[in-house]
C-alpha cells in the first residue's frame, strides 16, 4: 500500500465505526495562543474533551503537525522529522477502553494485515493511579502476556499539567526485525531502533486535584495518535521515513538538483535535511506564514536557510529549493488543497528567501571566518548575536560551522544578548496581554458576549465584569480599567483593523472607551476611563464614536480596492501578507517578486479612485464558506475562516456576482458605498522584507486632512522659494542642482588641500624590501574622502600600497589601497594593522578599511613596516 491508500484506509475504517471525519486543523493553533504550532491531533478538540462542546461524540482525523524542538537532529537520525501527519481517533464521553483497543487491533491486523507477531503493547503498571488492569485484560484477548509490557508514569501515564484531566495510556510497538542491538533480550524498552512505537492510545479517565489526589472524571475520553510516517515505514518494510514514498520523490529530485547520489553519510544527511525542510516549509507557507525574524516566521526562515546551507555544502551555487515545490504539490496537493491552490505563491516566497539568504550567507560566513580565526575554543555569544542582528545570520548555522571547526558556541551569552535587545524593544502592552489572557481564560465560559456593531452604533447593555488597571476582577470601578458587556457595538481590534472608541453612560457617571480588543474568541474587552462608579451587573448606555468608525471604514474599504487593483495590475503573484487599518491611515502588505514600477503604482491608485468615483455599492452578507470558491472570493493564504463566513462585495449585489469589482472574506467594518471614501491617496510604497512590500495610504476624511496639511506645507515652501505652488518642484530641483554643484566644488577644494599637505596632512613615501609605501594622515577627512584620496594617490603611485588614516577622538579610521603595480594584499595588511592595535578591518585584496585605537603616528607607521 502507498501512503495515500494507508491514510485513506485509516479515515474510512473509523468512519465505519461511527466516527465523524474531521479535516485537519491549521498548523497555527486557533484556540490556544500559548502554542507555536499544532503538534498533536487532539489540539482542535480541547473544548470537546472538556465537555464545553457537545456537538461531536466520535471523531477521526489526519492532522498536520509541526514539532521544532529537534531541528538540529533532522538529517542525522532515522526518525526525526519537523513536519508529520498524525492519524487519530477520538471519543468524547462515548466509546472507551475496550472498543479503542479492539478497533486498533482490528485495523492493524485485519485492514492492514500486519502480522500479529510483529506487534507488542505496553500498559500502565501503576503508581500515582492503580495498575491498568482493564487494558491488560482487553489486550490479553489479542496477545500473549509475554508481549504485554508494564511501564510507569514516564511512558504510560498522560497528564495535561500538574492538575486536571489525566489517565493511563497504552502504546503499540512494531518490530522492525533483528537489525538493532541484536541482543537476545532486546525488547520495547530498548532504544536500538528495532521496536518502534507506532500508536499511542490515551484513556483520559481521571482528574488530578491540587492536593495530588486522583478522582474519576464524569466524562471519560479517548485520545489516540499514530504517526503516518511510522505506519508507512512498517507497511513498506523500510527502516526510515525517508525511505518511504512520503519522501522518496522529493529525495530523487533533490539528487538531480544537488548532483549527488546519496550513498555516503554526508550526502544522505543533506538529502534528508533538504527533503524534510522543504516539506515543512511548503506546509507552513500554505498556512500564510512568511519568513521573518520572530515566532513562526523565524522557524520557517531557519528551516529554509538550514536546507540551503547544506545544499551549498554539496556544491549548489544558487537557489534550488523552490524547484522542489512542484514535487511536494504532486504528492500532497490533492489531499491538502491549500498547497495546490497556492503552489506558485509558495514557490515565489521560497525563491525570494533563497536569493536573500545567499547574499546573507556570503557576508555572514566572511565575518564568521574572521571571528573563528580570533577565537580559541569558544565563539562568544556577543559575536554570534552580532552576526544574527547585523547580517541575519542564524545562530544555528554559526553553531554548526563552529562545531565543524572544533569550536563551541557560548549559547548562554548569546541568549543574554538577544534578551537584552528584546528588552529594549518590548512593550508593556505585550507583557500585559499575557496577563489578561491568563485571567480571562479562567472565567471565559461565563463571559460570552454578542457583537451588534454591524447593525447598531449604540445599544443598552449589561456589565458582566469589571477589572481594575492591574487586571484584578472588582465589583466597582472608578478610574482606568476594563469591562466586558453582554452585547456591544464596539468592533474589537482584529483582522488588521483597530478597535472602535466611544463611551458608556449611566445615571450617575460615564466612561470613555479608548479601544476594544478580543483576547479570546468569545470576549470583547473594553479599555475604559471611568468618571463616577461603574458596577458589575449594572445597565448602561453604550455608543461608539461615529466619526472615528466612518474614517476607519473608509480606510478599510480602500484597502479592498487597492488589493484588487494590485492583483489586476501586477498579477497572480500578489497575495495579502498583512494589513493595518485605523481612522488616520492604512497599510497594506503584499507579496511581490519585484518592486512595482511608478507606472504600475499610478495605475493601481487610478483603478481604486475610479471605483470611488463610480459610487459602487458595498454589500456584506453571511454565507456558507463553500460559496467563496463559487463566487471567486479573495481569501488570505492560511487563514482559518468561520463557517458561515462574512463576505464583503464591492460593485455588485450577490445576485449578480459577475459584475463585482472585488469580493473578500472579511469581518471588518466598511462603508455602504465607495463614494463615501472620497479619494484614495498613496503616501509611500517600499520593501518591507524579502519578497514583501508595503503600501501606506489614506482615504476618506483622513485623505482630506492629509491634503490640507500637505497643501499648507507646500504653500509655506512656495513662499520661502518665492515662487508659485505650481513651480515649486522645478524650483526645488534648481536649488538641489546648485547645492550638488557647490558640494562637488567643496569636495574638490578639500582634496586639493589634503593632498597638498595643508590642514595637518602628512604624506610620507618609503620603500621597504622593494615595496613602495605611501602613508598619509588626513586630518578632518571623512570616510568617503579617505577612499577618494587613496584612489587618487594610487593613480600617481602605480606600484605602491597606500595607507591613509584619520583620527576621531580615541578611534582611528584607516584605508589601505593596493595600486595596480603593487603585489601587497590590502586586506591582509589592514587586518594585520587592526589585530595589533585593538581594532577590526575587512575588505578585498585591492581595497580594505578598518578602525583601531589611536596611537602615536610614528608607531602606526612602524607597525605597517613590520607587517610588510
Curated annotation (Swiss-Prot):
Entry comment, domain topic: Consists of three domains; the N-terminal catalytic domain, the editing domain and the C-terminal C-Ala domain. The editing domain removes incorrectly charged amino acids, while the C-Ala domain, along with tRNA(Ala), serves as a bridge to cooperatively bring together the editing and aminoacylation centers thus stimulating deacylation of misacylated tRNAs.
Catalysed reaction equations from the record: tRNA(Ala) + L-alanine + ATP = L-alanyl-tRNA(Ala) + AMP + diphosphate
Cofactor binding, note field: Binds 1 zinc ion per subunit.
HAMAP family (UniProt xref): Ala_tRNA_synth_B
Main localization (coarse): cytoplasm
Name of this protein: Alanine--tRNA ligase
Keyword Glycosyltransferase tagged: no
Disulfide bonds: none
One term under GO cellular component: cytosol
Cofactor: Zn(2+)
Compartment(s) where it occurs, according to its Swiss-Prot or TrEMBL record: Cytoplasm
The organism's taxonomic lineage, starting at the top: Bacteria, Pseudomonadati, Elusimicrobiota, Elusimicrobia, Elusimicrobiales
An individual GO BP term: alanyl-tRNA aminoacylation
Family recorded in the similarity comment: Belongs to the class-II aminoacyl-tRNA synthetase family.
Pfam families on file: DHHA1, tRNA-synt_2c, tRNA_SAD
Record key words, sorted: Aminoacyl-tRNA synthetase, ATP-binding, Cytoplasm, Ligase, Metal-binding, Nucleotide-binding, Protein biosynthesis, RNA-binding, tRNA-binding, Zinc
Organism of derivation: Elusimicrobium minutum (strain Pei191)
Alphabetical list of InterPro entries matching this protein: aa-tRNA-synth_II/BPL/LPL (IPR045864), Ala-tRNA-lgiase_IIc (IPR002318), Ala-tRNA-ligase_IIc_anticod-bd (IPR018162), Ala-tRNA-synth_IIc_core (IPR018165), Ala-tRNA-synth_IIc_N (IPR018164), Ala-tRNA_ligase (IPR050058), Ala_tRNA_ligase_euk/bac (IPR023033), DHHA1_dom (IPR003156)
Enzymatic class: ligase
Amino acid at each position: 500500500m502507498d501512503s495515500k491508500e494507508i491514510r485513506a484506509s485509516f479515515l474510512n475504517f473509523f468512519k465505519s465505526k461511527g466516527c465523524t471525519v474531521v479535516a485537519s486543523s491549521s498548523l497555527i493553533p486557533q484556540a490556544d495562543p500559548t502554542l507555536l504550532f499544532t503538534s498533536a491531533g487532539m489540539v482542535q478538540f480541547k473544548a470537546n474533551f472538556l465537555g464545553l462542546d457537545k456537538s461531536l461524540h466520535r471523531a477521526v482525523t489526519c492532522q498536520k503537525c509541526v514539532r521544532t524542538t529537534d531541528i538540529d537532529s533532522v538529517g542525522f537520525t532515522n526518525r526525526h522529522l519537523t513536519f508529520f501527519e498524525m492519524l487519530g481517533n477520538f471519543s468524547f464521553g462515548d466509546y472507551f477502553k475496550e472498543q479503542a483497543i479492539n478497533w486498533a487491533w482490528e485495523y492493524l491486523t485485519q485492514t492492514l494485515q500486519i502480522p500479529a507477531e510483529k506487534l507488542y503493547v505496553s500498559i500502565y503498571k501503576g503508581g500515582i493511579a492503580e495498575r491498568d488492569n482493564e487494558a491488560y485484560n482487553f489486550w490479553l484477548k489479542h496477545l500473549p502476556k509475554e508481549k504485554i509490557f508494564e511501564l510507569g508514569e514516564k511512558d504510560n501515564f498522560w497528564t495535561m499539567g500538574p492538575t486536571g484531566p489525566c489517565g493511563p495510556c497504552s502504546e503499540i510497538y512494531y518490530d522492525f526485525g533483528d537489525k538493532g542491538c541484536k541482543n537476545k533480550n532486546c525488547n520495547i524498552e530498548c532504544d536500538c531502533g528495532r521496536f518502534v512505537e507506532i500508536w499511542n492510545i490515551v484513556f483520559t479517565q481521571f482528574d488530578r486535584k491540587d492536593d495530588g489526589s486522583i478522582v474519576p472524571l464524569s466524562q471519560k475520553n479517548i485520545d489516540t495518535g499514530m504517526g503516518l510516517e511510522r505506519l508507512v515505514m512498517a507497511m513498506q518494510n523500510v527502516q526510515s521515513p525517508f525511505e518511504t514514498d512520503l519522501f522518496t520523490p522529493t529525495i530523487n529530485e533533490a539528487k538531480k538538483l544537488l548532483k549527488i547520489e546519496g550513498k555516503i553519510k554526508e550526502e544522505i544527511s543533506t538529502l534528508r535535511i533538504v527533503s524534510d525542510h522543504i516539506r515543512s516549509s511548503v506546509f507552513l507557507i500554505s498556512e500564510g506564514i512568511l519568513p521573518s525574524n520572530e515566532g513562526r516566521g523565524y522557524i520557517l526562515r531557519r528551516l529554509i536557510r538550514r536546507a540551503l546551507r547544506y545544499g551549498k555544502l554539496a556544491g549548489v551555487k544558487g537557489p534550488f529549493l523552490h524547484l522542489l515545490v512542484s514535487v511536494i504539490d504532486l504528492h500532497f496537493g490533492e489531499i491538502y488543497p491549500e498547497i495546490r491552490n497556492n503552489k506558485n505563491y509558495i514557490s515565489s516566497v521560497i525563491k525570494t528567501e533563497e536569493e536573500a539568504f545567499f547574499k546573507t550567507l556570503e557576508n555572514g560566513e566572511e565575518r564568521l571566518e574572521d571571528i573563528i580565526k580570533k577565537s580559541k575554543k569558544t565563539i562568544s555569544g556577543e559575536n554570534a548575536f552580532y552576526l544574527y542582528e547585523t547580517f541575519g545570520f542564524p545562530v544555528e548555522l554559526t553553531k554548526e560551522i563552529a562545531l565543524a571547526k572544533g569550536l563551541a558556541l557560548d549559547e548562554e551569552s548569546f541568549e543574554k544578548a538577544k534578551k537584552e535587545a528584546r528588552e529594549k524593544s518590548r512593550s508593556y502592552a505585550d507583557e500585559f496581554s499575557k496577563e489578561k489572557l491568563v485571567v480571562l481564560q479562567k472565567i471565559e465560559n461565563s463571559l460570552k458576549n454578542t457583537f451588534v456593531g454591524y447593525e447598531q452604533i449604540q445599544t443598552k447593555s449589561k456589565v458582566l465584569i469589571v477589572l481594575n488597571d492591574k487586571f484584578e476582577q472588582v465589583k466597582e470601578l472608578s478610574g482606568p480599567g476594563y469591562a466586558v458587556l453582554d452585547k456591544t457595538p464596539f468592533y474589537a481590534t482584529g483582522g488588521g483593523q483597530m478597535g472602535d472608541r466611544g463611551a458608556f453612560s449611566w445615571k450617575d457617571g460615564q466612561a470613555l472607551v479608548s479601544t476594544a480588543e478580543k483576547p479570546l474568541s468569545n470576549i470583547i474587552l473594553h479599555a475604559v476611563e471611568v468618571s463616577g462608579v461603574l458596577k458589575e451587573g449594572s445597565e448602561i448606555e453604550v455608543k461608539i464614536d461615529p466619526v472615528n468608525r466612518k474614517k476607519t471604514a473608509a480606510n478599510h474599504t480602500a484597502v479592498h480596492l487597492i488589493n484588487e487593483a494590485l492583483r489586476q495590475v501586477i498579477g497572480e503573484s500578489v497575495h495579502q501578507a498583512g494589513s493595518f487599518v485605523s481612522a488616520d491611515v492604512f497599510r497594506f502588505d503584499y507579496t511581490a517578486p519585484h518592486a512595482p514600477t511608478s507606472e504600475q503604482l499610478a495605475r493601481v491608485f487610478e483603478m481604486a479612485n475610479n471605483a470611488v468615483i463610480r459610487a459602487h455599492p458595498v454589500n456584506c452578507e453571511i454565507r456558507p464558506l463553500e460559496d467563496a470558491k463559487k463566487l471567486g472570493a479573495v481569501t488570505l493564504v492560511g487563514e482559518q475562516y468561520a463557517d458561515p463566513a462574512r463576505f464583503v462585495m464591492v460593485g455588485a449585489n450577490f445576485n449578480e456576482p459577475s459584475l463585482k469589482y472585488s469580493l473578500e472574506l472579511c469581518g471588518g467594518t466598511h462603508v455602504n458605498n465607495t463614494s463615501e471614501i472620497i479619494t484614495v491617496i498613496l503616501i509611500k510604497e517600499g520593501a518591507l522584507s524579502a519578497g514583501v512590500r508595503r503600501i501606506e495610504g489614506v482615504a476618506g476624511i483622513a485623505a482630506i486632512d492629509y491634503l490640507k496639511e500637505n497643501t499648507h506645507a507646500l504653500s509655506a515652501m512656495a513662499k520661502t522659494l518665492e515662487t508659485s505652488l505650481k513651480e515649486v518642484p522645478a524650483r526645488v530641483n534648481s536649488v538641489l542642482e546648485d547645492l550638488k554643484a557647490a558640494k562637488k566644488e567643496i569636495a574638490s577644494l578639500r582634496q586639493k588641500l589634503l593632498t597638498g599637505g595643508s590642514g595637518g596632512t602628512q604624506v610620507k613615501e618609503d620603500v621597504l624590501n622593494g615595496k613602495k609605501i605611501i602613508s598619509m594622515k588626513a586630518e578632518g577627512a571623512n570616510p568617503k574622502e579617505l577612499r577618494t584620496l587613496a584612489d587618487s594617490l594610487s593613480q600617481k603611485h602605480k606600484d605602491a600600497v597606500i595607507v591613509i588614516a584619520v583620527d576621531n577622538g580615541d578611534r582611528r579610521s584607516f584605508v589601505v589601497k593596493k595600486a595596480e603595480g603593487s603585489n601587497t594584499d590590502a586586506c591582509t595588511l589592514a587586518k594585520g594593522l587592526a589585530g595589533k592595535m585593538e581594532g577590526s578591518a575587512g575588505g578585498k585584496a585591492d581595497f580594505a578599511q578598518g578602525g583601531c585605537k589611536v596611537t602615536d603616528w610614528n608607531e602606526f607607521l612602524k607597525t605597517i613596516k613590520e607587517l610588510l
